[in-house]
């Protein structure tokens, strides 16, 4: 070919050099980030929510990763709670037990009410039945002291003066 002669372009090929090869299959941003949560949908919600005039490209990816991590953490703990109760299916009760028994999740979701979750079991130790001699000896051997309210352990002023 001569110098300066035009090279015919391939149909549909873009770019400076005319591109080459077949068109590649599009890859979603969720797949690129290695996430299960939808990055594109979260980005769309951020834009439609009018949280800001402009949304950076990394913001929906980061938010999707955080949401996926939190969901995985709650589901893992709820699955453990279901297994502890000898159940195969996670119900709202298991989710509540998982969240309230975890210190950090409990702090994060302190003001959240979970429908059909119930409450954490909490029985005052004074109301529990008395321990048998062998159980009390075993507990004393391990160095544990039974928890009881301060009122039950403090003496009355008359008894304190007599002693």
UniProtKB/Swiss-Prot annotation:
PANTHER family: HISTONE H2A. Contains 2 SPKK motifs which may interact with the minor groove of A/T-rich DNA sites. Phosphorylation of this motif may regulate DNA binding. This motif is reiterated in both termini of histone H1 and in the N-terminus of sea urchin histones H2B, but its presence in the C-terminus seems to be unique to plant H2A. GO terms for biological process: heterochromatin formation. Keywords: Chromosome, DNA-binding, Nucleosome core, Nucleus. Belongs to the histone H2A family. GO terms for cellular component: nucleosome; nucleus. GO terms for molecular function: DNA binding; protein heterodimerization activity; structural constituent of chromatin. It is found in: Nucleus; Chromosome. SUPFAM superfamilies: Histone-fold. PROSITE patterns: HISTONE_H2A (PS00046). Residues 12-21 have a biased composition (Gly residues). Residues 1-30, 134-163 are annotated as: Disordered. Its main location: nucleus. Residues 147-163 have a biased composition (Basic residues). A motif (SPKK motif 1) lies at residues 148-151. A motif (SPKK motif 2) lies at residues 156-159. The nucleosome is a histone octamer containing two molecules each of H2A, H2B, H3 and H4 assembled in one H3-H4 heterotetramer and two H2A-H2B heterodimers. The octamer wraps approximately 147 bp of DNA. It comes from the Eukaryota. Core component of nucleosome. Nucleosomes wrap and compact DNA into chromatin, limiting DNA accessibility to the cellular machineries which require DNA as a template. Histones thereby play a central role in transcription regulation, DNA repair, DNA replication and chromosomal stability. DNA accessibility is regulated via a complex set of post-translational modifications of histones, also called histone code, and nucleosome remodeling. The keyword Nucleus applies. This is Probable histone H2A.4.
